[in-house]
């Protein structure tokens, strides 16, 4: 679904560059050119911009067989790639109408890299931030509300389950906000999360 792809691009680059195929009637000009200010994340910046102009879709076929080697940008200049990818994410936060502080951006990056453990205080801060993103999108309707909410809930679940060393307090925080807690979470996942606490 194009709206699901669009919502996902708010959080991370989900488009595998070598597999992109454009229709011939795509608008021309600067809107379909790489922005040189995003050196190692030019593709992500382009997709994040284009997704607001055209529909993206997936073809359910394997189009590329990837051979990974030690000289890929991902391996040789990962730091730069992350830095420019973060610039794209900041730009998308601004598109929602949020003038985010450095601390907000740092928290946003930490949430997206959800293998980090959160303190109880930063977990509460993350909940406030995610709720803020949800509310701004609900007002501006830039991303499909259903898909955007699902992704917000997904990240909320990930960061809560990565912080289970704080026991039942984390489970209470997770369930404490109905807008963030995932009602469609299977009983199996809820039980596993509960037992981890």
Where are these regions (language model features)?
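Conserved nucleotide-sugar donor-binding catalytic segment
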Residues: 1-110
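C-terminal subregions of glycosyltransferases and related glycan-biosynthesis enzymes
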Residues: 68-197
């Amino acid at each position: 679904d194009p709206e699901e792809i669009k919502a996902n691009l708010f959080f991370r680059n989900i488009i595998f560059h070598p597999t992109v195929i454009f229709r011939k009637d795509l608008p021309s000009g600067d809107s379909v050119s790489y922005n040189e200010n995003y050196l190692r994340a030019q593709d992500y910046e382009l997709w994040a911009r284009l997704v607001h102009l055209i529909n993206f879709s997936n073809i359910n076929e394997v189009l590329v067989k990837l051979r990974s080697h030690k000289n890929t940008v991902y391996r040789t200049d990962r730091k730069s790639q992350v830095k420019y990818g973060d610039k794209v994410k900041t730009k998308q936060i601004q598109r929602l109408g949020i003038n985010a502080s450095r601390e907000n951006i740092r928290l946003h990056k930490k949430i997206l890299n959800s293998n980090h453990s959160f303190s109880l205080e930063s977990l509460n801060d993350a909940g406030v931030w995610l709720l803020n993103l949800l509310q701004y999108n609900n007002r501006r309707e830039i991303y499909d509300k259903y898909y955007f909410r699902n992704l917000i809930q997904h990240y909320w679940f990930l960061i809560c389950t990565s912080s289970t060393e704080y026991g039942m307090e984390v489970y209470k925080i997770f369930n404490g906000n109905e807008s963030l807690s995932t009602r469609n979470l299977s009983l199996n996942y809820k039980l596993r999360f509960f037992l981890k606490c």
